[in-house]
Amino acid sequence: MKLYSYSHCPFCARVKYVAGKLGIKLDDVVLDYDDTETPTKLIGKKMVPILEMDDGTVMSESNEIISLFIELAGSSESNKPTQGAIEWQGGSFAPLLQIGLPRWPLLDLKEFKTESSRIAWEDNKQSIELNFVNLIASTPEIVLQVNGFLIGTEKQLNINNGKTSLSLLDSAIYFSILRGLYCEPTITWPEQLNQWMNYQALESHVPLLR
Protein backbone atom coordinates (compact mmCIF):
# COMPACT_ATOMS: atom_id res chain seq x y z
CA MET A 1 0.00 0.00 0.00
CA LYS A 2 1.15 3.51 -0.80
CA LEU A 3 0.52 6.51 1.45
CA TYR A 4 0.76 10.01 0.01
CA SER A 5 1.51 12.42 2.82
CA TYR A 6 3.25 15.48 4.23
CA SER A 7 5.72 15.06 7.09
CA HIS A 8 4.27 17.97 9.09
CA CYS A 9 0.61 16.97 8.73
CA PRO A 10 -0.95 15.70 12.00
CA PHE A 11 -3.57 13.66 10.16
CA CYS A 12 -0.85 11.98 8.09
CA ALA A 13 1.20 11.38 11.24
CA ARG A 14 -1.88 9.83 12.85
CA VAL A 15 -2.20 7.32 10.02
CA LYS A 16 1.53 6.53 10.03
CA TYR A 17 1.50 6.14 13.82
CA VAL A 18 -1.28 3.55 13.73
CA ALA A 19 0.39 1.72 10.85
CA GLY A 20 3.68 1.66 12.72
CA LYS A 21 2.16 0.43 15.96
CA LEU A 22 0.21 -2.31 14.15
CA GLY A 23 3.19 -3.39 12.03
CA ILE A 24 1.55 -2.43 8.74
CA LYS A 25 4.08 -1.69 6.00
CA LEU A 26 3.51 1.42 3.90
CA ASP A 27 5.32 2.96 0.96
CA ASP A 28 5.33 6.54 2.25
CA VAL A 29 5.39 9.08 -0.60
CA VAL A 30 5.91 12.61 0.72
CA LEU A 31 4.56 15.08 -1.84
CA ASP A 32 5.96 18.52 -2.52
CA TYR A 33 3.66 21.00 -0.82
CA ASP A 34 2.98 22.76 -4.13
CA ASP A 35 2.24 19.51 -5.97
CA THR A 36 -1.46 19.81 -6.77
CA GLU A 37 -1.39 17.48 -9.78
CA THR A 38 -0.74 14.20 -7.94
CA PRO A 39 -3.49 14.41 -5.30
CA THR A 40 -5.95 15.88 -7.82
CA LYS A 41 -5.41 12.90 -10.12
CA LEU A 42 -6.01 10.53 -7.22
CA ILE A 43 -8.99 12.10 -5.41
CA GLY A 44 -9.93 15.23 -7.35
CA LYS A 45 -8.47 17.76 -4.92
CA LYS A 46 -5.31 18.74 -3.05
CA MET A 47 -5.52 16.89 0.25
CA VAL A 48 -3.52 14.34 2.23
CA PRO A 49 -3.27 11.68 3.52
CA ILE A 50 -4.23 9.49 0.57
CA LEU A 51 -3.95 5.72 0.77
CA GLU A 52 -3.58 3.91 -2.55
CA MET A 53 -4.16 0.20 -2.14
CA ASP A 54 -2.57 -2.54 -4.20
CA ASP A 55 -5.69 -2.89 -6.35
CA GLY A 56 -5.60 0.83 -7.22
CA THR A 57 -8.47 1.96 -5.01
CA VAL A 58 -7.87 5.05 -2.90
CA MET A 59 -9.00 6.37 0.49
CA SER A 60 -8.55 9.94 1.68
CA GLU A 61 -10.12 10.21 5.14
CA SER A 62 -7.64 9.55 7.93
CA ASN A 63 -10.28 7.98 10.19
CA GLU A 64 -11.34 5.58 7.44
CA ILE A 65 -7.73 4.66 6.72
CA ILE A 66 -7.09 3.99 10.41
CA SER A 67 -10.23 1.85 10.64
CA LEU A 68 -8.97 -0.17 7.66
CA PHE A 69 -5.58 -0.69 9.32
CA ILE A 70 -7.21 -1.90 12.54
CA GLU A 71 -9.32 -4.33 10.52
CA LEU A 72 -6.37 -5.57 8.44
CA ALA A 73 -4.31 -6.17 11.58
CA GLY A 74 -7.12 -8.14 13.20
CA SER A 75 -6.80 -5.81 16.18
CA SER A 76 -9.36 -5.44 18.95
CA GLU A 77 -8.54 -1.72 19.24
CA SER A 78 -11.46 0.70 18.95
CA ASN A 79 -11.68 2.82 15.81
CA LYS A 80 -13.53 5.56 17.73
CA PRO A 81 -11.77 8.20 19.84
CA THR A 82 -12.94 8.97 23.36
CA GLN A 83 -14.77 12.21 24.11
CA GLY A 84 -11.79 13.39 26.15
CA ALA A 85 -9.45 13.07 23.18
CA ILE A 86 -11.94 14.82 20.89
CA GLU A 87 -12.32 17.74 23.29
CA TRP A 88 -8.56 18.01 23.81
CA GLN A 89 -8.01 18.03 20.06
CA GLY A 90 -10.47 20.90 19.70
CA GLY A 91 -8.34 23.06 21.98
CA SER A 92 -4.99 21.96 20.58
CA PHE A 93 -4.96 23.41 17.09
CA ALA A 94 -4.56 27.07 18.13
CA PRO A 95 -1.20 26.52 19.89
CA LEU A 96 -0.12 24.03 17.23
CA LEU A 97 -0.70 26.47 14.38
CA GLN A 98 0.86 29.41 16.22
CA ILE A 99 4.03 27.41 16.75
CA GLY A 100 4.09 25.28 13.63
CA LEU A 101 2.97 27.41 10.72
CA PRO A 102 5.99 29.75 10.60
CA ARG A 103 8.50 27.06 11.63
CA TRP A 104 7.71 23.82 9.80
CA PRO A 105 8.90 25.13 6.40
CA LEU A 106 12.27 25.87 8.02
CA LEU A 107 12.76 22.24 9.04
CA ASP A 108 14.38 19.62 6.83
CA LEU A 109 11.06 18.22 5.61
CA LYS A 110 10.62 16.70 2.16
CA GLU A 111 7.49 18.67 1.30
CA PHE A 112 9.39 21.95 1.69
CA LYS A 113 12.57 21.13 -0.23
CA THR A 114 11.82 23.59 -3.05
CA GLU A 115 11.43 27.34 -2.85
CA SER A 116 8.14 27.11 -4.72
CA SER A 117 6.73 24.76 -2.07
CA ARG A 118 7.72 27.14 0.73
CA ILE A 119 6.16 30.07 -1.12
CA ALA A 120 2.97 28.07 -1.65
CA TRP A 121 2.85 27.28 2.06
CA GLU A 122 3.15 30.93 3.02
CA ASP A 123 0.54 31.96 0.47
CA ASN A 124 -1.92 29.32 1.68
CA LYS A 125 -1.39 29.42 5.43
CA GLN A 126 -0.56 33.00 6.33
CA SER A 127 -3.38 35.31 7.39
CA ILE A 128 -3.89 38.52 9.32
CA GLU A 129 -4.33 36.54 12.55
CA LEU A 130 -1.57 34.06 11.72
CA ASN A 131 1.05 36.40 10.30
CA PHE A 132 4.34 34.53 10.34
CA VAL A 133 6.52 37.52 11.27
CA ASN A 134 4.19 38.47 14.12
CA LEU A 135 4.02 34.89 15.37
CA ILE A 136 7.80 34.63 15.56
CA ALA A 137 8.00 38.01 17.29
CA SER A 138 5.42 36.81 19.84
CA THR A 139 7.31 33.60 20.60
CA PRO A 140 7.86 34.25 24.34
CA GLU A 141 4.17 34.91 24.97
CA ILE A 142 3.03 31.98 22.84
CA VAL A 143 5.52 29.62 24.50
CA LEU A 144 4.19 30.54 27.95
CA GLN A 145 0.70 29.54 26.82
CA VAL A 146 2.00 26.33 25.25
CA ASN A 147 3.89 25.42 28.42
CA GLY A 148 0.67 25.66 30.40
CA PHE A 149 -1.17 23.65 27.77
CA LEU A 150 1.44 20.88 28.00
CA ILE A 151 1.25 20.74 31.79
CA GLY A 152 -2.50 20.27 31.51
CA THR A 153 -2.04 17.63 28.83
CA GLU A 154 0.38 15.62 30.96
CA LYS A 155 -2.11 15.60 33.83
CA GLN A 156 -4.92 14.51 31.50
CA LEU A 157 -2.90 11.60 30.11
CA ASN A 158 -2.00 10.29 33.59
CA ILE A 159 1.40 9.09 32.43
CA ASN A 160 3.32 6.65 34.62
CA ASN A 161 6.93 5.83 33.72
CA GLY A 162 6.36 7.00 30.17
CA LYS A 163 3.25 4.87 29.66
CA THR A 164 -0.49 5.50 29.61
CA SER A 165 -3.70 3.48 29.43
CA LEU A 166 -4.79 5.30 26.26
CA SER A 167 -6.31 3.42 23.36
CA LEU A 168 -4.36 3.21 20.11
CA LEU A 169 -6.50 5.86 18.42
CA ASP A 170 -6.42 8.27 21.36
CA SER A 171 -2.63 7.86 21.54
CA ALA A 172 -2.44 8.62 17.82
CA ILE A 173 -4.45 11.82 18.27
CA TYR A 174 -2.32 13.15 21.12
CA PHE A 175 0.98 12.13 19.56
CA SER A 176 0.23 13.42 16.07
CA ILE A 177 -0.57 16.91 17.33
CA LEU A 178 2.02 17.25 20.09
CA ARG A 179 4.91 16.18 17.83
CA GLY A 180 4.44 19.38 15.84
CA LEU A 181 5.40 21.53 18.83
CA TYR A 182 8.97 20.20 19.06
CA CYS A 183 10.07 22.64 16.36
CA GLU A 184 10.30 25.42 18.97
CA PRO A 185 13.24 24.66 21.29
CA THR A 186 12.27 27.12 24.04
CA ILE A 187 9.12 25.17 24.89
CA THR A 188 9.41 23.41 28.27
CA TRP A 189 8.18 19.83 28.08
CA PRO A 190 6.92 18.19 31.27
CA GLU A 191 9.19 15.23 32.00
CA GLN A 192 6.64 12.42 31.82
CA LEU A 193 4.96 13.81 28.69
CA ASN A 194 8.29 14.25 26.93
CA GLN A 195 9.30 10.70 27.87
CA TRP A 196 6.02 9.36 26.50
CA MET A 197 6.37 11.32 23.25
CA ASN A 198 9.90 10.10 22.60
CA TYR A 199 8.89 6.52 23.38
CA GLN A 200 5.94 6.72 20.99
CA ALA A 201 8.14 8.16 18.25
CA LEU A 202 10.50 5.20 18.58
CA GLU A 203 7.72 2.61 18.71
CA SER A 204 5.76 4.01 15.76
CA HIS A 205 8.75 5.09 13.64
CA VAL A 206 7.15 8.54 13.28
CA PRO A 207 9.74 11.18 14.22
CA LEU A 208 9.10 14.30 16.26
CA LEU A 209 9.24 17.54 14.28
CA ARG A 210 12.50 19.22 15.16
Regions found by a protein language model. Name each.
Residues G74-Q83, N124-L135, V206-R210:
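Short secondary-structure transition/capping segments
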Residues L42-G44, G74, E129, T186, ...:
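Glycine-centered secondary-structure boundary/capping sites
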Residues N194-R210:
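Short, mixed-charge aromatic SLiMs
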Residues M1-E122, I159-N161:
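GST-like domain detector, emphasizing the conserved glutathione-binding G-site
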